[in-house]
């Protein structure tokens, strides 16, 4: 918005954000900015640099985990994945309270802005090649729809990553499902299922939206048809809880062809 107010045209704005994702300073010899934009550029670059700063880094065989500090001091996690992917957070904390997830122990602290979501992608791209973005870190994307959709649109438009390579991971929510169907951009979708039995699933995801497994899978099949891309279902195996034959039989009775089951 500041660039527009300073007289920038779409070509200036596009080059600015593309350079931001690449970590390169704007080449003023290639794109001549209006004088008003030139004047505010240093403060804009400083503002963006201060949105997220690295606090910790931990490397393992499964990826590189960064703890990033937001401008208000809150901490979030961002993980560089194998095969040029990055997992980003959408909230500080989470309200869902999945029994196997540590993030929900603290509850929801605050929403991330669209710039903070996109900024995690930018931070990863400055440090390694990134071709896929997974919104599967801290937080529940369906509880922060405005920032999530704005960030996804920004990432797709300026980072060079296609919308099919952006995955929104959710426990399932009618508001998100409606927004996805109405959106021109159709990102890939991953749904945290974890059980094919309604009562058991509610015990594992105690504060998830009131949707039956059947309703979730029916939407998944519909979205896969519209988006021309299979839905991913996530299943964290818990010994003696959701790893029995009864789960297999229940899931088989509801399963759609246009789906992938990822067991963790």
For the regions a protein language model found, what residue spans apply to each?
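Acidic-residue sensor for enzyme active/binding pockets
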Residues: 77, 116, 120, 140, ...
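Canonical Radical SAM [4Fe-4S] cluster-binding loop centered on the CxxxCxxC motif
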Residues: 81-116, 123
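Generic beta-structure capping elements
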Residues: 71, 81-83, 91-93, 104, ...
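Conserved AdoMet/S-adenosylmethionine-binding subsite of the radical SAM
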Residues: 125-132, 137-264
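Residues in well-ordered beta-strands of folded domains
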Residues: 55, 67-69, 79, 89, ...
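Flexible, acidic/Gly-rich N-terminal and inter-domain linker regions that tether
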Residues: 1-84
